[in-house]
Curated annotation (Swiss-Prot):
UniProt cofactor(s): Mg(2+)
Positions bound to Mg(2+): 107, 109, 152
Pathway: Siderophore biosynthesis; enterobactin biosynthesis
The EC number(s) this enzyme carries: 2.7.8.-
S-S bonds: none
GO cellular component terms, A-Z: enterobactin synthetase complex; plasma membrane
Enzyme class label: transferase
Native organism taxonomy: Bacteria, Pseudomonadati, Pseudomonadota, Gammaproteobacteria, Enterobacterales
Name used for this protein in its record: Enterobactin synthase component D
Superkingdom of source: Bacteria
Listed InterPro entries: 4-PPantetheinyl_Trfase_dom, 4-PPantetheinyl_Trfase_dom_sf, 4PPT_N, Enbac_synth_compD-like
Catalyzed reactions: apo-[aryl-carrier protein] + CoA = holo-[aryl-carrier protein] + adenosine 3',5'-bisphosphate + H(+); apo-[peptidyl-carrier protein] + CoA = holo-[peptidyl-carrier protein] + adenosine 3',5'-bisphosphate + H(+)
Assembly and interaction partners: EntB, EntD, EntE, and EntF form a multienzyme complex called enterobactin synthase.
Length: 234
């Protein structure tokens, strides 16, 4: 499959972005993935997206001296090496990944049309959040896409600690040209209730990318070895 990769410093991390041409995908492209058998029943588009995401993840891991391909967990989540946290996302013909010494979540979404934003808004935000989005200087479709993406990034950062929370479990409290703040409610995770999480964002073409990096650690989180931590951008 034809791909192009470039790293992009953002919010104290380095995003590894992979643009790919799904039409050039061939089944044998998957053979270098140790878990390729688990993708046998997936559709062609899904296989291409998965491959691009893992290519981005491999680039991210190599940056910290780790040569590995993240496997697939029981909940289809990426499995990262001990002591490292990571996140993968893809949309249309772009995939990206990020590695960190602390919990991290990244998401990329195509900016909604006006019609789609109007239709989906009630399922993503409440009336208070709508006022915040409308008070920003951003067009509503862009603002709503950011709200959706920010909540996705927060969920990814803590996916192993929460049980499929709804969009109403994290509320937008502020939105400006560079970041979004979200207030976590008990429905998100009791141990994280009433915390505020800051999500950084930027626009790339007709898509937005959001990233949350959280210093929160839990009893079973393992710290990365010093040799690895020293190589990870702060």
């Amino acid at each position: 499959m034809l791909t192009s990769h470039f790293p992009l410093p953002f919010a104290g991390h380095r995003l590894h972005i992979v643009d790919f041409d799904a039409s050039s995908f061939h089944e044998h492209d998957l053979l270098w993935l140790p878990h390729h058998d688990r993708l046998r029943s997936a559709g062609r588009k899904r296989k291409a997206e998965h491959l691009a995401g893992r290519i981005a993840a491999v680039h991210a891991l190599r940056e910290v001296g780790v040569r590995a391909v993240p496997g697939i967990g029981d909940k289809r989540q990426p499995l990262w090496p001990d002591g490292l946290f990571g996140s993968i996302s893809h949309c249309a013909s772009t995939a990206l990944a990020v590695i960190s010494r602390q919990r991290v979540g990244v998401d990329i979404e195509k900016i909604m049309s006006q019609h789609t934003a109007t239709e989906l808004a009630p399922s993503i935000i409440d009336s208070d959040e709508r006022q915040i989005l409308q008070a920003s200087s951003l067009p509503f479709p862009l603002a709503l896409t950011l709200a959706f993406s920010a909540k996705e990034s927060v969920y990814k950062a803590f996916s192993d600690r929460v049980t499929l929370p709804g969009f109403d479990s994290a509320k937008i409290t502020s939105l400006n040209a560079t970041h979004i703040s979200l207030h976590l409610l008990p429905a998100f995770a009791a141990m994280m209730a009433e915390r505020t999480v800051r999500t950084e964002w930027f626009q790339r073409g007709n898509s937005v990318i959001t990233l949350v990096s959280a210093i929160t650690r839990f009893p079973h989180d393992r710290s990365a070895p010093a040799s690895i931590l020293s190589a990870i951008p702060r």
